[in-house]
Amino acid sequence: MHTGVKTAVQQYIDGCAAADSRRVADAFDAGAVMWGYLGDEYVTMTGAEFATQVVGTATPAGPEYRSEIQRIEVTGKVASAVLVEEGFLGSNFRNELGLVERDGRWRIVSKVFTTL
């Protein structure tokens, strides 16, 4: 598993669990966008909006929160990761993350998600 990619995904996980909007925002590239479904509702926002509007207004996760990085694939300076979360804000999620290495650092540039 590529260390830099795993570090970026783990930063996202740790930030979500701690309700730390700055940590989550830093895991995303400045131009990151996300799309997906909360139940039947289609949602899209930037990574920065997710960090401030969702994570920034949440309380830290309790013991019910679990996460698993199920897959990481790296080709050159691009990567994809599958992250499954249980008990995040009362729901379970499957996240498909796109990452890019730029200036020596991996960041999330896209997130496609659905509730499970």
Give residue ranges: language-model regions.
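Surface-exposed, charged secondary-structure patches
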Residues: 4, 13, 33-38, 43-92
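Short beta-strand segments enriched in hydrophobic/aromatic residues
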Residues: 28-29, 85-87, 112-113
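Short secondary-structure boundary/capping segments
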Residues: 24, 70-71, 98
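Feature marks short, surface-exposed loop/turn motifs that line or immediately flank catalytic pockets
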Residues: 31-32, 116
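Residue-level detector of alpha-helical recognition elements and their boundaries
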Residues: 20, 27, 38-40, 47, ...
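Short, low-complexity N-terminal intrinsically disordered segments enriched in polar/charged residues
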Residues: 1-22, 26-30, 48
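Residue-level recognition of short loop/turn positions
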Residues: 31, 75, 103-105
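Short beta-strand edge/turn micro-motifs at domain boundaries
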Residues: 94-116
